[in-house]
């Protein structure tokens, strides 16, 4: 297994680690500990960086593989969807936003698996809108977890601004997610039609 694919697997492994720290505390409760959100934010930021790094190295070293094309967006989905579920728990992410994200991910993942299981074994890579969507999602999540940690520190106003920004970014994420999903299905409509 090459290095870019190892980085992708590392991102998947970091998902349950992120979940552990976010689950240790909850904003709005008496025993809320911002340190755990800070640690979770650092873990998420590190995992997000591997998303940039694995793609960059795969292209630079000509190590693009079918596994990478399939596993890289899957790792992104796991990481960001889990984070948004916890943001919903905290009251920052609207259920509407999460439903749009889940609907898009299920539809696109279903299409990818269907294409991979077809006779020609086609692997559908992420498109530009999918990458824009992922970057927006990751920035929103990073703003939220670091912002939440700061609201209980010495930089209350900066932290509050970050949390406020992350709330509105969630809606921007919903728009980008919907557009990327529609474009993805449209670009692969020929496969969808033949699969009927």
Q: Which residues does each PLM region occupy?
A:
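Alpha-helical transmembrane bundles and membrane-interface segments of multipass inner-membrane proteins
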Residues: 1-196
């Amino acid at each position: 297994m090459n290095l870019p694919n190892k980085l992708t697997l590392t991102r998947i492994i970091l998902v349950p680690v992120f979940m552990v720290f976010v689950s240790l505390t909850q904003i709005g409760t008496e025993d809320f500990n911002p340190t755990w959100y800070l640690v979770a934010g650092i873990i998420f930021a590190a995992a997000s960086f591997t998303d940039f790094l694995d793609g960059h190295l795969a292209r630079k070293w000509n190590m693009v593989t079918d596994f990478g094309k399939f596993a890289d967006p899957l790792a992104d989905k796991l990481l960001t969807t889990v984070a948004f579920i916890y943001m919903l728990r905290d009251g920052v992410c609207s259920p509407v936003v999460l439903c749009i994200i889940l609907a898009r991910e299920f539809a696109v993942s279903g299409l990818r698996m269907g294409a991979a299981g077809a006779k020609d074994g086609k692997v559908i890579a992420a498109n530009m809108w999918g990458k824009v969507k992922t970057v927006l999602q990751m920035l929103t999540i990073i703003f939220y977890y670091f912002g939440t940690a700061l609201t209980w520190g010495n930089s209350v106003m900066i932290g509050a601004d970050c949390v406020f920004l992350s709330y509105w970014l969630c809606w921007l994420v919903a728009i980008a997610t919907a557009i990327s999903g529609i474009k993805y299905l449209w670009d692969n409509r020929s496969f969808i039609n033949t699969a009927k």
